[in-house]
Amino acid sequence: MKRIILLSAAALTLATAAIPAAAAPGKKGNSHILWYDKPATMWTEALPIGNSRLGAMVYGTPAADRLQLNEETIWAGRPNNNANPEAREYLPKVRELVWQGKYKEAQDMATAHVMAKTNSGMPYQPFGDLYINFPGQDNYTDYRRELSLDSARVVTEYKSGGVNFKREYISSLSGNVIMVHLTADRKGMITCNANMISPQQDVTIASEGKEIVLSGISGWHEGLKGKVLFTGRATATTIGGTVVSKDGVLQIKGADEATIYLTIATNFRKYNDISGNDTLISRNTLHEAVKSPFAQLKQKHYDLYRSQFGRVCLDLGKDLYADRTTDWRVEHFKEHNDEHLVETYFQFGRYLLICTSQPGTQPPTLQGIWNDKMLPSWDSKYTCNINLEMNYWPAEVANLSELTAPLFSLIKDVSETGRETARTMYGADGWVLHHNTDLWRVTGAIDKAPSGLWPTGGAWMAQHLWEHYLYTGDKQFLASVYPEMRDAARFLNQTMVRNPNNTNWMICPSLSPENPHPHHATTAAGVTMDNELIFDLFSHVIEASRI
């Protein structure tokens, strides 16, 4: 694709996944860098790497390093949908209360009889952690930890015992592995022990040949048993020294340099299919990866990453604070005209999308692909009343158009599960999406009515389909997604009702997300946001039908 140079701050109408960090970029070479002079002490200080399937938060502690690990399909629960069949009977009653101005009573009735009863969707969950312990390195100097946005790698460097050590961390776009490359400026100095742990249930940790293996099953949630089977597998190659796996610990001794390779696989194949073989997939993936030396895999990863990241350059001026750590620049941003920090924040958003939304993978959740909790905030799901959309605001405008593919796959999936929900809850044709979905593509109205009684998520999703066509002019793509746009419109057309107080057609009940009105409720009729979304969708469907 054509390289684009953006010279205006107006290009910063973008959003990033919810990972805290920002930092100092540059103009040429390896210059877009987030850097720090101390290890991470908490999860939000660790640095994110990812290839859309595997994510890691890298702490960079010299004596006891930690990589918190995620695999995109490790979610609680199992295939299901959560539409409430009671809704079809009670929605007309809720609507009548709205017409009477009894908004609080309408909202309470909807919470009791319209919202999902089985579950509110499943949480995204962690695989666990890789710990790498380096004996004798508790004392160190000259510490530096950085995330290079130009090469999509984290680097940790420090001096201990008179030896300079360096670690490179990559979640490879060219192979489904995370690599940790260990070097020193003196031969025979790489000695460490690596092991994996997990907060998940029924976990088994073992050694197989020169590999360590951790397998388990995802967690229960809201009475739904977890059925995602997963296997994590790691090994190491060295120049000099030895590698031994014993009792679930990978032992590297006296190496000149070493590379740890790690992969994770699950039995997930599709939202309604968990028949995959995680054991076989993980074994084959790891064995294929170690056939190539680190330098070769690193170059392949770099080439693929740069083919996407390198399309856009934003130049806001000279970097005046390159010698300052990123956390200092963030802390003092309000005191300085640090335009370069703004530039890097823009590129950091693009980096995060590249790390979380490659074609053929799941879309980024509320936290991208990075999560260390079994029950994260808002379950780290796909929240469709702005958050999922926000993740993709940079995609077209920042020249990452093909990274919309995971979102479009999700839309296709929820158009299937949402068809069942439309019939069950509303007695309507077409498909419906409320304000959240998950790996299993549930489409029922979840949580309580004040936040979840919102049936126009499909209209907002469809805007991204139309936007992609406008940016690409791809008529074949438009033809392939037209049924999803049309059927989202069909549902809304069939569920619109005439307000007896003014004879206008509108959606009722609904709400304006996170925006209560003076009647001590959010439940309402004909909210402005719905009107705008419906107008856009109907207009786009009509125009698409003529192309």
Functional labels for PLM-detected ranges:
Residues 499-500, 514:
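Catalytic cores of eukaryotic secretory-pathway lumenal/extracellular enzymes that build
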Residues 1-25:
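Bacterial Sec-dependent N-terminal signal peptides
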Residues 24-450, 456, 465-469, 474, ...:
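Aromatic-residue-lined binding/catalytic grooves and analogous aromatic/hydrophobic interfacial grooves
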Residues 508-544:
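C-terminal, helix-dominated tail/subdomain
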